[in-house]
Amino acid sequence: MFARDTPTKSVQKGAFAADREPPTVETMTTDAHRSRPLRFGLHTALPRGTEFSTFANSVQDAGFDVLTIPDHLVASVSPFAGATAAAMATTHLHTGTLVLNNDLRHPVDTARETATVAAISGGRFELGLGAGHMKSEYDAAGLRFESGRTRVDRLIESVNVIRPLLAGEPVDVDGAHYCVRAEAGELVAPPGVHIPLLIGGNGTRLLQLAGRVADIAGLAGFSHNRDATKVNLTHFDAAGLKDRIAVVRDAAGDRFDAIVLNALIQFVVRTDDREASAAELAAAFGGISPEFVLDSPFVLLGTHEQMAEALVERQRQFGVSYWTVFDEWVGRASAMPDIAKVIALLR
């Protein structure tokens, strides 16, 4: 998940079958989801050099709970180094990856880096994992870009390596993609703290994996075509989010109550005229209506008071308690100033 992945052009609205009834609030989420304290994350990739520590402190002072960093082969902050720098510069801000491209590292290396950041930060780190999707980055680095099924298969095996290593347990994985055998504590020094695992994306198999093993299910609201040249708004409206949460729920079974639901808000617009701003966004997207934009849980429009009310209502409706917004990037202003004011209203 990254600022340049957001749906600003070449988008296709997903078609929903007329006879498909979205899950109701009562059956989709539980009181555990609707009663959790709201958490807020800021997602940044902008290189700031020696000013990064100052920036991390400003994020903490603004009331955010988490500073997350993406994992793309572009001129941006690298995820583990950035997370470590942010943790060292702050006192209670959590850091994390949103999300690591599993194909860029061996899972043993991912576990080693994760354990180190978690130990240094005193447990203020959450590990977000994904299957990778930007074909252009694979091509530029000379990496083979395989099918989505293969990439998710590889992520599943990777998780089966990473989790026991971080827990200080022996690992014995002999799969199609990884073969790792080690005694407890042999390859990775366990950090001695629980590291929340976030599995993020929009695809069904990814979210099923989140339901089975993750502490946090990260919901993006959209997907890409095979080479990531088009964004498909398949689950960008209320019915779509409910559908994706239902996938997590069905895979989770009895552990669903314990899973934190996270959503990545793609656009934050401070405005006194929500309808006009929705029309502007719809025109920028192309092929969707202002009503579709207003219905999207992944868009936040209005005054700061309206935004605060909307987030409270969305937690009631969807059970999402952890909301992430974007920092500045090329062509995009940071959502931090507006969301800082929203956070102040909610706390």
Regions found by a protein language model. Give the residues of each.
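Accessible peptide chain termini
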Residues: 1-2, 28
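Cationic, amphipathic, low-complexity segments that mediate targeting or membrane/lipid association
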Residues: 2-8
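Active-site-adjacent structural elements that line small-molecule/cofactor binding pockets in enzymes
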Residues: 12-14, 19-347
